């Protein structure tokens, strides 16, 4: 049964006989399978840590050059948000954001930038065919990359990098052609929180109306969006979150605990 299809892959639901459990099979549509090969490399690296599956990383069952078999998870945050008429309670959204941040921090600790933080890539666990909202996972590492070399050095800052990701939630720097680092994941994370609380983002209408916008144009629109338009009617802590994310440096390790404590203050 087909679950999802994108420009690069098709995802099917299946059933494993030994041991008996539901699985998903992701097939690369590209001739050379480059996108899925990258995702497999990322998953293999993360799962060198035996505790990875307890930190919000989907469990990998098997893989080949053009296919990836994973555990079947529940619905996505996007699915739940749609089913809730684009309305999460404030506290539910913030609690969810804290779980998301914990997973992003873990992915970064493995030397990886996710590169496509958005509601549809966060999946809930599944228990007996039903979504388990206590467990959250971050999926889809097709656009992910290592930000650390094997010797531990950070990748260099670059300009003129082709944009990958989802424009609606992407950071303004990556849309503008700058190399991604941890700050881009956290900027996207900030936009996701705003979206889950308010149900929209300031640039949604412009992105929808102007069909000829390229990534650079979208980045410029985000860069010129005023702070007050993003955090209007939200608690004062969101101004601190905005300033924190907006002043992150390319090479610097983010202070995740500071950000988490700001979120906890709002509960």
What is the role of each PLM region?
Residues 1-6, 11:
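Protein kinase glycine-rich loop
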